[in-house]
Amino acid sequence: SSDVCSSDLRGGKTTLLRDIIRQLSNGEEKKKMPGVTVGVVDERSELAGSYQGVPQNDLGMRTDVLDGCPKAEGMEMLIRSMSPAVVAVDELGRKEDFKAVESVIHSGCKVIATAHGNSIEDVIHQPYFERLVRRRVFERYIFLDKGEHAGTILGIYDRNGRPC
């Protein structure tokens, strides 16, 4: 499914995204969940932590990383040349990022992303996010706590904004 994880600054979004990427890529044999190809656009090297083009963080064995590449351009490149099942990006924010997410979805790929916001209302009312919400692009919205409870899930909502 296509999901977005949201919180305020330092809420654990990037850490959760990194873990999701690794688990999707590696799969889980005991749960009979095969791994899938994941394409990561790591604009600021926060997910893979690449050094001289080599990821330093484990993002899984079926993960391709575009490091230092603008999100929108990277998403387009991934779907045209790498054929990922899932595209992962950190911190959607610019208009072109949201347009690229729509292109990825229309190509048949799933998207896992993060964005700033501490409630479903925050996300729904962001200028460029609003269009994706109306079109029900994301199947789940995951909200994380911040501060001393960073990374704790506050709530999960479906594409209609209802708690799951």
Task: Identify what each model region corresponds to.
Residues 13:
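Conserved lysine of the Walker
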Residues 1-6:
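Short, small-residue-biased leader/transition segments that mark boundaries at the very start
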Residues 21, 75-76, 98-102:
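Generic hydrophobic/aromatic pocket-lining and core-packing "Φ" positions
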Residues 139-164:
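Conserved P-loop NTPase
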Residues 8-10:
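The conserved Walker
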Residues 25-78:
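P-loop NTPase switch/communication element
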Residues 16, 20:
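Hydrophobic positions on the alpha1 helix immediately C-terminal to the Walker A/P-loop
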Residues 82-142, 146:
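Conserved P-loop NTPase nucleotide-binding/switch module
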